[in-house]
Every structure is written in structure tokens, then in C-alpha cells.
UniProtKB/Swiss-Prot annotation:
The lineage of its organism: Bacteria, Pseudomonadati, Pseudomonadota, Gammaproteobacteria, Vibrionales. GO terms for biological process: DNA recombination; regulation of DNA-templated transcription; regulation of translation. Pfam families: Bac_DNA_binding (PF00216). Keywords: DNA recombination, DNA-binding, Transcription, Transcription regulation, Translation regulation. Belongs to the bacterial histone-like protein family. This is Integration host factor subunit beta. It comes from Vibrio vulnificus (strain YJ016). InterPro entries: Hist_DNA-bd, Histone-like_DNA-bd_CS, IHF-like_DNA-bd_dom_sf, IHF_beta. GO terms for cellular component: chromosome; cytosol.
């Protein structure tokens, strides 16, 4: 689901709100989440999961076009860990 699809779905379900209000709310939530992670803080949404930063160690990678080895610096990347309720809801089997 894309951000646009999420907004459309919420508009269909929340008819008492304008599409602009819903779009602004979704954008604000995502912006707050991004700025929270940017500052190094963790986000926890009970029953859904948590977002945090994980450090990737420096490593030797490969340029897919040329095959040349490339030194990649260490960096922090966003990480999502689903909560128990979400894992149980999507468990197939």
C-alpha cells in the first residue's frame, strides 16, 4: 500500500473529514516519525511494532555495473520490528 492508497482508504472510511485533513494528518505522522528516528530515538506503537536505527558495519561491496569492489562506510539504517499482535495477525500457516 502506498501513501496515496492509504489516504484514499482513510478518506473512504472517515467521511466526516476532508481529504486535505486526512492527507495532512498522514504526512504529519510520517514526518514526526522520520524526525524522531533522525534524532536517534525509538518509536514504539503497542500492538503494531517498533522502529529504531540499526548500525551497519563498514564493508566491502561490489558495483553491480562494473563488478569492481567498493568500500562502503558504516551507517545507521531504519529497522522495523513487528509486535506480537501484528506477527500473529499476519502469520500464515
Amino acid at each position: 500500500m502506498t501513501k496515496s492508497e492509504l489516504i484514499e482508504r482513510l478518506c473512504a472510511e472517515q467521511t466526516h473529514l476532508s481529504a486535505k485533513e486526512i492527507e495532512d494528518a498522514v504526512k504529519d505522522i510520517l514526518e514526526h516519525m522520520a524526525s524522531t528516528l533522525e534524532s536517534g530515538d525509538r518509536i514504539e506503537i503497542r500492538g503494531f511494532g517498533s522502529f529504531s536505527l540499526h548500525y551497519r558495519e563498514p564493508r566491502v561491496g561490489r558495483n553491480p555495473k562494473t563488478g569492481d569492489k567498493v568500500e562502503l562506510e558504516g551507517k545507521y539504517v531504519p529497522h522495523f520490528k513487528p509486535g506480537k499482535e501484528l506477527r500473529e495477525r499476519v502469520h500464515i500457516g
